[in-house]
C-alpha cells in the first residue's frame, strides 16, 4: 500500500513498470503499458467477431462500445448463429474464412464454430470425427491471417441444479431427471476429489438406479466429447495457435460434473501461461471482455482498474451459479481484458464498484422482496458510489445482489441521487459473473467515449436489467400465470404478439417514470429473441 502513496505521477510510472514486467512474464498479452485516459481510438482497426449465439447481449450489445470507438466489427448474419436451436456452422465457417483476411484481430466463440452455438453444445449429436474436423479448422484461422491475433472463448457443459433450472436448454430428459443427474454428478465429483461417506455412497447407488442408463450415457457421452474438444483448444493456446483461449464454467456449482471437468482440465493446462489460457465461472460476458482485450491490444493500452465492494462479505462471496469467489472471477476478468488492478482509485482509469449482498446470499430480480423498498445496504452503496463520482473517478457498477435483474432499491437510490448517467458502466443481468464481466469490459471502453455515446450504452442496460428484468418481466409473468397454459414463460406461443405489445407499453412507462428524457425512448420497441419471457430485445430508435 505504501508504494502507492507518493503522488500521481510516481504511481502512474510505477504501475506502468509493473505492467511491463507482467507482460514480459506472460501475464498480459504483449501490449505497451499506457493509461486508458491517454489512449486514442485506433480508427480503422477491424475485429472479426463470431458471437456464441444471437441474443442481444451476445451480439450487438457486446460489439457496441468498440464500434462507437471507431473500430469495424465484422459480425455474421444472425441467421447463421444459434439460439435455442443450432445455428449453421458450415455457413458460419464460410463467412469467417472469407472475411478473416480483413481483420486485425478475431474474437470467436468456439461453441458457435464447433457445435452451432452455446445451447447446441449441450444438445448436439455430432460424431467425434465431425468435432475433431471443426476443432482443427479453428487452428486454420491463424494460418489464413498469421498477423491476426485470435481471442477464442468456449464453455464447459453446464450442470443445472434441476429440470426447471435448465430453462429447457438441455436435452428433454433433463426436465424429468435433472435434479438426480445434478446430485449424482456432484457425488461423483466429491468421490473423485475427497471420497464419500457411507451415507453418500448409498445415495449414489440409489441415484444410479433412479436415472435410466440411456439417459446418463447420452449426457456423459456428450460431456466426454466436449471435454476432448476443450483439451485440444487448450493445446492450441499452449502452442500459440490461439493467442488467448478463455473457457467458461457455465452455470456451475462447487460439486458438479462441470466442476470435476474443470479440475481435470486445470491439471492438464498447468503448463500454459495465464496470458494465453484462463478458465473461470461464467460464459456470456466473455465476448465483451475479449472485445475489450482486442481494442486494448490494438490501441496499445493497459487500463488501470480499482475494484471496490459493498460492505459485508464483499469479494469473498461465492455467487449463485459459480464455484469460486467473485474476487477470483474479477481477477481473471482483468487478466482476460488486458487490464491491471491498482489499489488507489485516484490512480485508476476505471473504478469498478461491486454491489454484493452484505451476507453473501443473493436474491433474484423477480422475487417479491425486490420491491424497491429502501434498504441500508443499498442506500449506503449509492452514497459510496457518489463519493467516487464526485471525486472525479470514472465509475462502473456491477449490481450483483440478485441474479437475473437489478436491485430495485439500489437503482432507486442512484436515480434519486442523479447518478445513473454519471456512471461509465452498469450491469445487473443474469448471473453475477455475467454482470461483473460486462460492466468491467464495457466500462473500460466507455471511459474513452463521448458522454452521449456512454449514455446510449447505459440506456440499454437500464431498460433491460432494471426496467424489463426486475420490473416489467415480473409484472407480465404474473399476468400470464392467470392463463390456463402453464408453460408460457418458456414458450409464449400464441400469446407472444399480445405480450410483446404489453411489455413495450410498460417499458415506455417505466422509462418515463425513472429515466431522464432521451431521444427515441418514447418510441422504443420490444421483442422476444427466443420467444420466451426470460430473454428480451429492446430497440431504441437513434433519432
List where the protein language model places each region.
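Charged, low-complexity surface segments at secondary-structure and domain boundaries
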Residues: 1-3, 21, 218
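Bacterial N-terminal signal peptides
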Residues: 17-26
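Catalytic-site microenvironment of enzymes
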Residues: 14
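An N-terminal assembly and electron-transfer interface module characteristic of large anaerobic redox
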Residues: 38-543
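Acidic/proline-rich low-complexity IDRs
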Residues: 2, 26-27
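N-terminal secretory signal peptides that target proteins for export/translocation
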Residues: 1-11
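Boundary at the C-terminal end of the N-terminal hydrophobic targeting segment
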Residues: 31-35
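Generic detector of low-complexity/intrinsically disordered segments
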Residues: 5, 29-30
